[in-house]
Amino acid sequence: MQYSEIMIRYGELSTKKKNRMRFINKLKNNMEHVLSIYPDVSVKTDRDRGHVYLNGTDYHEVAESLKEIFGIQAFSPSFKVEKNVDTLVKAVQEIMTSVYKDGMTFKITAKRSDHSFELDSRALNHTLGDAVFSVLPNIKAQMKQPDINLKVEIRDEAAYISYEDIRGAGGLPVGTSGKGMLMLSGGIDSPVAGYLALKRGVDIEAVHFASPPYTSPGALKKAHDLTRKLTKFGGNIQFIEVPFTEIQEEIKAKAPEAYLMTLTRRFMMRITDRIREDRNGLVIINGESLGQVASQTLESMQAINAVTATPIIRPVVTMDKLEIIDIAQKIDTFDISIQPFEDCCTIFAPDRPKTNPKIKNTEQYEKRMDVEGLVERAVAGIMVTTIQPQADSDDVDDLIDDLL
């Protein structure tokens, strides 16, 4: 027998009574975006659960994609069978004999939304249970926590049988908590921060600062690839490339070396905030981890934050580097992040950056520059690209193109 659909059980959105259908519709949209790499797959949702119709597509590939989508609590692959008792008996016997191992217990859980079906749920439980005993006489029934819970659902169009419950990613559907601007470098931390924001339903847009010729096309592609890895959790992400060369050259020419990093980060924050305002974002998200580098001391954060009143979310702020790496490996961004391309945060990094910069000093150095003009030109020069999910085979094609 071949799986015909995957039944989706919702996560935390089940508690959002007033906005329930908005959450469900957003989850449906996200599933359609992520599963768009499987052209024959279709998605339907209702108030209680979702249905992913495979239409001949390999179940295992689709299941791997579903495991990453936030808002899904669990899912079950299901067999579609003809809606009559004899067919159900044969299907249940075939499934049970294929999955049963010595000592396992079982339970039949039948329900029907089609109340015209010839047996009610209780009678169907008994009939199908007897059918299992007839082919597996040594099996034992267990009502609480059985090894195999065979679920049978009678719908208007057909009957569906499932026995597996596969854990989903949990969290909230991406886009149900508003929009945030993710400051995405090419490092390990910021993609993890983006992932954690996505998990809580934030629709992220990735803001990446590029400083050619100091940063290479390889660094830009790396940022694109990191963004694409994040699309598997909720669908398309807008990638915003910010031209940053002029600003970095100006800072280097007019400020003391010890303050280069602080001033650079203040400009980045101003620009990201301006983009956020233009694109109706609510927050800024970054990958700062307290004490990890000189620009991530509390004093540095205070000096950098001073340029905006917008909330700054730092999902990894209390994590050790190894904790962040563990998540990066889990979400498959780590190997990309360690590719040897310099980003604009490293190209002019001073040997001894100021770890406790003073706000009054940063403001004094910025008076030497046309801050507003620099910010306006950078924002005017942004390039926005839609990054979409892609199949693993596309990754191979991209690698071949890069080599050629």
From Swiss-Prot:
Pathway membership, UniProt: Cofactor biosynthesis; thiamine diphosphate biosynthesis
Pfam families named among the record's database cross-references: ThiI, ThiI_fer, THUMP
GO cellular component terms, semicolon-separated: cytosol
Reaction(s) catalysed (UniProt annotation): [ThiI sulfur-carrier protein]-S-sulfanyl-L-cysteine + a uridine in tRNA + 2 reduced [2Fe-2S]-[ferredoxin] + ATP + H(+) = [ThiI sulfur-carrier protein]-L-cysteine + a 4-thiouridine in tRNA + 2 oxidized [2Fe-2S]-[ferredoxin] + AMP + diphosphate; [ThiS sulfur-carrier protein]-C-terminal Gly-Gly-AMP + S-sulfanyl-L-cysteinyl-[cysteine desulfurase] + AH2 = [ThiS sulfur-carrier protein]-C-terminal-Gly-aminoethanethioate + L-cysteinyl-[cysteine desulfurase] + A + AMP + 2 H(+)
Molecular functions (GO terms): ATP binding; CCA tRNA nucleotidyltransferase activity; tRNA binding; tRNA-uracil-4 sulfurtransferase activity
CDD domains to which the protein is assigned, alphabetical: PPase_ThiI (cd01712), THUMP_ThiI (cd11716)
GO terms under biological process: thiamine biosynthetic process; thiamine diphosphate biosynthetic process; thiazole biosynthetic process; tRNA 4-thiouridine biosynthesis
Localization: Cytoplasm
Alphabetical keyword list: ATP-binding, Cytoplasm, Nucleotide-binding, RNA-binding, Thiamine biosynthesis, Transferase, tRNA-binding
EC assignment: 2.8.1.4
Boundaries of every THUMP domain copy: 60-165
Protein residues bound to ATP: 183-184, 208-209, 265, 287, 296
Signal peptide (residue range): none
Chain's role: Catalyzes the ATP-dependent transfer of a sulfur to tRNA to produce 4-thiouridine in position 8 of tRNAs, which functions as a near-UV photosensor. Also catalyzes the transfer of sulfur to the sulfur carrier protein ThiS, forming ThiS-thiocarboxylate. This is a step in the synthesis of thiazole, in the thiamine biosynthesis pathway. The sulfur is donated as persulfide by IscS.
Family of the protein in this entry: Belongs to the ThiI family.
HAMAP family: ThiI
Stated name of the protein: Probable tRNA sulfurtransferase
Organism: Streptococcus agalactiae serotype V (strain ATCC BAA-611 / 2603 V/R)
Originating gene: thiI
